[in-house]
């Protein structure tokens, strides 16, 4: 069973905001005029980065109004991206205090504090009222939550009838054991990776109707190949996911890249409709 305290400890970093500011300065970004795009190398913490978020945006375009829920929002990068593109208000919830604290500061920094509001808490037991949101999504979150049926029950409770729930997670392909550490877990006890079929089964078990489910393996492989080539040419950028991953960033990224390239892991996209 994945312990939420261990998950929080895996991500918590009290110096993160200062590190992001230093990275922006190193890139000659004016801290008084920071754009959402300037933050995407560090706050779009998932395979594909901003391009990965666009898969979610394409599905959320079908929702013409209302407020969205970001389940496991992290620093709020996808929330700010989605809010800007679709002009929606977004609530986010995440376990990690520093992600929420600094995520709200980053929203203020880019002028999105009135549109994106992040709170600290468990996605399994949120403080929101039932039938509150017009859509929900989660981006690379389920790998840390083994109680997926309980999670999907809670999301269903929060959604208005017939609302969409979009999932973009790292998923298992086949039965090959995962090599750790990876970006979401230092070891197996922190990880809850499952395959696409199980995600769909759990969603349908609690009453969702799955309208789309697909693995985005080729997209992820292209992204990884481009990332590796760019790093060979440019070296490590001042602002990037290494700020979130700490001293073991290289091996975490190498392990997940290798496993996606060999086909044992892939990002999966699911669109489900609440009852």
Region locations from a protein language model:
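Class I SAM-dependent methyltransferase SAM/SAH-binding core
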Residues: 67-125
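A short glycine-rich, Lys/Arg-flanked "PGG" loop and its adjoining helix->strand segment in the class I
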Residues: 149-164
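A short SAM/SAH-binding and catalytic strip from SAM-dependent methyltransferases
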Residues: 134-147
